[in-house]
Amino acid sequence: MEFVYDVAESAVSPAVIKVIGLGGGGCNAINNMVANNVRSVEFISANTDAQSLAKNHAAKRIQLGTNLTRGLGAGANPDIGRAAAQEDREAIEEAIRGANMLFITTGMGGGTGTGSAPVVAEIAKSLGILTVAVVTRPFSYEGKRVHVAQAGLEQLKEHVDSLIIIPNDKLMTALGEDVTMREAFRAADNVLRDAVAGISEVVTCPSEIINLDFADVKTVMSNRGIAMMGSGYAQGIDRARMATDQAISSPLLDDVTLDGARGVLVNITTAPGCLKMSELSEVMKIVNQSAHPDLECKFGAAEDETMSEDAIRITIIATGLKEKGAVDPTPEREVEAVAPSKQEQSHIVEGMIRTNRGIRTMNLTAADFDNQSVLDDFEIPAILRRQHNSDK
C-alpha cells in the first residue's frame, strides 16, 4: 500500500524542516520526495554536475564548486567534492539557515556526495540545527567505492546527530535476484523518502491524543550516532504486533539492530477512537524488550480520519544503535539477570512502558553462556545470547 505523505503545518511555531540532497544520488532522492508529495518540508539540491542539477525539482538548487569543477562533476573524487562544498560554504549556509532540523541525503562512495556531506553537516551543526543524515552505502562488489564510502561515513559521523545507513547489498536480499537496477534504486529512494516523511510527520503533525513535538525528537536524536527508522502498516486482528514487527525489521536496514537502542520515538496512528490501551501496551512492550535498560523513550498517538477502523500505522525511530558486528570491548560485564519465577507487571510511566521484575545481578563471562546450570538459573537476555552465538 502506498501513502501520500501530508505533513500538516502546525498552527503555533512550527518546526522548520529542510532536506538537502547532495550529488547525483541525493538529488534523485529529492526528486522522488517531491514526486511523492512530501509536504511542509523545504527541499534543497546541491551538485557539482550542472546538467544534472538543471533537471532537479527542488525549489532551491546550489551549484557547488563552479570555479573548481566548471559544472562537470567531481569525477568520483571526494576531495573534489569537499573542496567544491568549501568553495560555496556561504551559499550552503544561506540555504539551510533558519531550519530547526536538517536531513542530509546522498549516496556514499561517489565524489560530490561523499566529500560534501561532512562539510554541510559541519555547517549545520555550527548553526545549532538538529542534523540527521540518511545515506546509502555501495554494493560490496563496487571495490574502491566501498572504501571511499566508509571513509566518508567516518567523517560524517563526527558532525551529524544521527545517521541512518541503507546498504545497497540489502536491496538484492529484500527484492530478489530478478529485480532490475531501476527497481532496486527506486526502492532505495523510497526508503530515504519514508525516513524523511516519517520523522517529519512526527515533528509537524499535532495530535489531540498523545502529542510528540520537536523537543521530543531532539531529545531522542541529538548526538546519538547510528539510527534506524521503520514504519509498519497492518489491519485486523493482531494488527499492533504485526505493524510493530514490520517497523523494526526492515530488510533494507539490516546492518543495524534495535538491540541496545538508547533512544526511541514511537508514533501510533489509527482511525479516530480506535486505538486500544492493550495495543499501546503491546507495541511498547515489544520495543522495550530489545532496547537498552536506560532507554529514553517517547511515544505519541495520532488519529487519521482517512484510515479504516481496523488499520494501524506505526513509525519507530531508534537511535544510539550499534552496527552488526560491533562488540563491547569489555570481555566481562555486569548484566541484569532475571528470575523467571517472578510475575511481570507493566505500567505506563511518563509515556513509556516499564517492566517491574524481581532482579538480582551477577557477573557473566563468556564461559557462562555454555554452562547449562547458569542458563537454568537465569534468563540470559536475548541480546547477549545472540551476540555470544555470533562470536563463535
From Swiss-Prot:
Gene Ontology cellular component list: cell division site; cytoplasm
Subcellular location: Cytoplasm
GO terms of biological process kind: division septum assembly; FtsZ-dependent cytokinesis; protein polymerization
Keywords: Cell cycle, Cell division, Cytoplasm, GTP-binding, Nucleotide-binding, Septation
SUPFAM superfamilies found in the cross-reference section: Tubulin C-terminal domain-like, Tubulin nucleotide-binding domain-like
One of the record's GO molecular function terms: GTP binding
UniProt: GTP binding residues: 24-28, 111-113, 142, 145, 189
InterPro entries: Cell_div_FtsZ, Cell_div_FtsZ_CS, FtsZ/CetZ, FtsZ_C, Tub_FtsZ_C, Tubulin/FtsZ-like_C, Tubulin/FtsZ_2-layer-sand-dom, Tubulin/FtsZ_GTPase_sf
Family: Belongs to the FtsZ family.
Assembly and oligomerization: Homodimer. Polymerizes to form a dynamic ring structure in a strictly GTP-dependent manner. Interacts directly with several other division proteins.
HAMAP family registered for this protein in UniProt: FtsZ (MF_00909)
The protein's role, per its UniProt record: Essential cell division protein that forms a contractile ring structure (Z ring) at the future cell division site. The regulation of the ring assembly controls the timing and the location of cell division. One of the functions of the FtsZ ring is to recruit other cell division proteins to the septum to produce a new cell wall between the dividing cells. Binds GTP and shows GTPase activity.
Name the UniProt record assigns to this protein: Cell division protein FtsZ
Species of origin: Neisseria gonorrhoeae
Underlying gene: ftsZ
